[in-house]
């Protein structure tokens, strides 16, 4: 981008873009991607794709339950310190307060349904990584 175009962007467009409050519906990350599929008053449905060898943080939520349905691939889930293998068709339920994570052995696609009265990205407590996985 030329410096003139960059200046126009900073002065004329950036203030508008910065003020958007619309929720991000798709994002690519180093570990894979996610796409928000449905938003309701007390639920949020997301398709999560983890790249082979990648994992999500070990974490919990205070105000929401989560249900994972594995729709493609194989990997491992850790739920409250217990590791188990997961594959296409498996369904896992994590109540609020439960520590959990996924690790992809192959590409792993999961439908994640978040259930609760106050679903928020701030409702996530991270824990140190588990060793070994």
PLM region spans:
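A short glycine-rich, His/Asp/Glu-containing loop-to-beta-strand
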Residues: 22-65
């Amino acid at each position: 981008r030329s410096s003139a175009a960059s200046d126009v962007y900073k002065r004329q467009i950036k203030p508008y873009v910065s003020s958007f409050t619309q929720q991000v519906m798709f994002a690519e990350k180093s570990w894979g991607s996610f796409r928000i599929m449905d938003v309701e008053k007390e639920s949020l449905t997301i398709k999560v794709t983890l790249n082979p060898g990648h994992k999500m943080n070990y974490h919990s939520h205070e105000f929401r339950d989560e249900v994972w349905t594995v729709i493609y691939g194989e990997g491992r889930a850790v739920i409250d310190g217990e590791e188990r293998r997961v594959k296409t068709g498996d369904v896992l339920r994590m109540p609020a307060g439960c520590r959990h994570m996924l690790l992809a052995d192959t590409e792993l696609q999961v439908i994640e349904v978040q259930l609760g009265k106050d679903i928020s990205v701030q409702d996530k407590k991270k824990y140190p990584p588990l060793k070994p996985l």
